[in-house]
Structures are given as structure tokens and as C-alpha cells.
């Protein structure tokens, strides 16, 4: 008979646990109590792919879809709370949310196919921490916040503070995003999200731009936020682009300054989907177009 192998023995794979708590506190306890690799499952559209390609091998998966507060969209005094496990397709079915934040809803409805949208959530898209995530520039432009639950209680942070780099977040051990908060819209406000992709649909953004703005009664821009995706290590807020709009009537000159500021903020990479130079140019073009779309909505036209 052949001699037994003499090399180092291969460690046995640990058995993966699957838990489905029904309260946030129970979910946090599970996340905080596991010493090894833990993942939260909301929609699973990113996690399951990562597991199948051996990019992650969790010892514990915590399914949060059975927590009622994470499965609902609630409106109060014009603001919205979106549970972390609410699927993108459900956002489009919420009339009040769609009317108040059409750019955010449009961005969510660009996450993959219709089948993916029936599972993928805004919180999952945010915590996956892809620089090219479609919903994140729209959320950042909207001034959205994330409610984080953890062993030390809850805290609320701007959504742009979650991702720290590709696939990396600022969440501490035992923490999870419980909900996304969208503020009340002032009158004469509008938002929009646009992206460039090589194909007509179901592709990753080469560049994504979210714009949110508010006008006064005379049509002067009083507030604006501009966010860019896929042009840096994470989605970025561009204050200089917003400054190009604030305090003036938005005309061709203001839009040119906006486009220039957006392009100047880019720190992209070269890859098979686009060169640095291409992304920088497209960012300016999309910023202008997204601002024009947001402006039309703010004017009610």
C-alpha cells in the first residue's frame, strides 16, 4: 500500500453556523460573541457570491431578515427610515419615498437585475463597500445617515463614514447597520443619480454621480451635495462641486464649474472598464447631467 503523506496536515474546516435572530439585540449579541469570521445576511447578493468564490469563509452567518424593524420603510414628519433588510424593489413601490427621493430610488433600482433587486438592500450595498456601488453616491448626496447597533448601544453616522476602502468599513466588532435614514426634503428640492456603464444594464458603474440640491423662491441654489462613485477608493463627497452651485442661479457657467470640480476630485484607477482619463472626463459630464436632472425636479418641471 502507498505510504501515508508525510507533509503537514491540512486543518479541518470549521462547521459554519447559521442563526436567524428576531431582535436587533439578539443579532448584536451573536455578532459580538463570535471570535472568528462573521457575516450579516440581509439580501445575500454579495455574500453568497463571495462565499462561492472562496473570497470569504464565515464561521457564523447572522440572517437579519426575521427582525421586523429591519424589514419596513417608515415615514415620519417627512423623513424616512429604511430598514437594513428592505429590498431595493420595495423602495420603488413606496410612493411617498419615490416622490421625495427619486434619485435614491432610481439608484437602488440599478443594483443588478430585477431578481437581484428583489433581494439586495441599501444597507448591504453600503456595507459591501464597493467604490462602484450604485446606491451609495445617491445616499451620500441625499445627506443620508446610517443607524448602527452594537454592544455599546446605537449610534448614527453619515453614510459616507461607513466605507473606508474597497471591501472595508468602519464598523466595529459586533456592530451592524440597522437602518438608513433619509432627511425631510425642503421645498423646491431635487435629486438625481446617473452612471456610465459599458453595457445597457446589469453592469458595474465605470462612474456614478449623485446630485441633490435646493432652490429658494427666486430660483437661487441654497444647498447642494455632489457625490462620486467608482473614481476613488470609496464613494466621495465633493464640496467644491457643490460650491459651484450654491448661492447662484444654476446656469451654463455654474454647470461648467460643477463639472470641472467633479473631474478635479477624481482619483481613479485604470482597469478593463475604463482608463483614468476616461473616468475623469465622464465624471464631469455626468455631474452636469445629474445636476440638470435634479434642477428640473427642484423646479417641478
Task: For each feature predicted by the language model, list its residue ranges.
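C-terminal structural segment of proteins
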Residues: 5-301
Amino acid at each position: 500500500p502507498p505510504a501515508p503523506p508525510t507533509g503537514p496536515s491540512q486543518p479541518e474546516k470549521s462547521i459554519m453556523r447559521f442563526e436567524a435572530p428576531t431582535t436587533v439585540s439578539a443579532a448584536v449579541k451573536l455578532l459580538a460573541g463570535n471570535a472568528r469570521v462573521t457575516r450579516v445576511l440581509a439580501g445575500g447578493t454579495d455574500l453568497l457570491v463571495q462565499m462561492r468564490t472562496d473570497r470569504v469563509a464565515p464561521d457564523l452567518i447572522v440572517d437579519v431578515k426575521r427582525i421586523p424593524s429591519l424589514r419596513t420603510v417608515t415615514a415620519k414628519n417627512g423623513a424616512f427610515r429604511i430598514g437594513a433588510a428592505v429590498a431595493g424593489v420595495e423602495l420603488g413601490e413606496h410612493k411617498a419615498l419615490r416622490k421625495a427621493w427619486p434619485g435614491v430610488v432610481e439608484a437602488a433600482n440599478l443594483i443588478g437585475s430585477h431578481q437581484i433587486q428583489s433581494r439586495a438592500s441599501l444597507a448591504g450595498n453600503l456595507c459591501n463597500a464597493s467604490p462602484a456601488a450604485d446606491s451609495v453616491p445617491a445616499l451620500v448626496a441625499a445627506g443620508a445617515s446610517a443607524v448602527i447597533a452594537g454592544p455599546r448601544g446605537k449610534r448614527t453616522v453619515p453614510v459616507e463614514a461607513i466605507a473606508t476602502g474597497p471591501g472595508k468599513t468602519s464598523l466595529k466588532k459586533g456592530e451592524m447597520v440597522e437602518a438608513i435614514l433619509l432627511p425631510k426634503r425642503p421645498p423646491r428640492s431635487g435629486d438625481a443619480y446617473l452612471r456610465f456603464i459599458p453595457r445597457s444594464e446589469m453592469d458595474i458603474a465605470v462612474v456614478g454621480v449623485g446630485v441633490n440640491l435646493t432652490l429658494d423662491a427666486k430660483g437661487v441654489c441654497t444647498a447642494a451635495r455632489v457625490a462620486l462613485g467608482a473614481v476613488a477608493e470609496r464613494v466621495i463627497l465633493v464640496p467644491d462641486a457643490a460650491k459651484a452651485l450654491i448661492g447662484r442661479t444654476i446656469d451654463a457657467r455654474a454647470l461648467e464649474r460643477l463639472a470641472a470640480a467633479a473631474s478635479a476630485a477624481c482619483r481613479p484607477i485604470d482597469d478593463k472598464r475604463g482608463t483614468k482619463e476616461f473616468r475623469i472626463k465622464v465624471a464631469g459630464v455626468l455631474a452636469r447631467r445629474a445636476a440638470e436632472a435634479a434642477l428640473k425636479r427642484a423646479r417641478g418641471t
